[in-house]
């Protein structure tokens, strides 16, 4: 990728989208929520009619969201507001706003339900908050290096992995000690990170390149073992419910690639115009819901027909996406 495209991709990295039940949606049908980063709100979308039915105000620059372990709240991270907005995933009503969460860009709950981990993208640290099911208490702030971007927590709640967007690194943080275990160089502009079900491999989207980099993290020292060419601006991941395939959005190429997790080969690709970013997937794996960052759209992609089936107008710079009716995570 030439330097002009790299600069363009860097300037466009801020984004967010999600899917849940909400106001204006037929009873029993979980809606789609899309985070409009530059409008500071959430688009609520009816998946029966594929129309926007409501807007929910948030703090400034909502980018990513995550469901609480009890599935009672969708937590939206508002990076420039230093807040979290808790939304009922079934009624789309705002439950509360938690203040004093510094620069929350990306977030993950640990599988053991004890921790909320937050990447402070602009301030170069990852924060650990104790979670008791209701309250958040800052336990540790870990200085990571330049621009921590996306997070992944292993299935045993032992390790947090964070990509370093501007220093081209992958960092592992021990949850027990909340100290950095190791760091390793990656390709250009690492963004999303996804772990295999056995916790032995990590897939990293190289947004400044055209590839997904695969790391073996099964031993004491990590190793880069492969680069899978997918398309320019490889960025975000979402797996099918059976864990056999991994979708990656290629933001500059305007495509979504499908990777076989066993062979680590691209087996299919789909058109996704407008700068595809975050994704969610239907339970049967047929439908991909993806934000088009530069087109102010939510795209619904039919993987059987290999085409865009629906385009829904949303707000400015749509980023995160979530739905209660999705493939198992």
Residue ranges with predicted function:
Residues 2-13:
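Bacterial N-terminal signal peptides that target proteins for export
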Residues 18, 22-329:
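Predominantly soluble domains enriched in secretory-pathway, periplasmic, or organellar proteins
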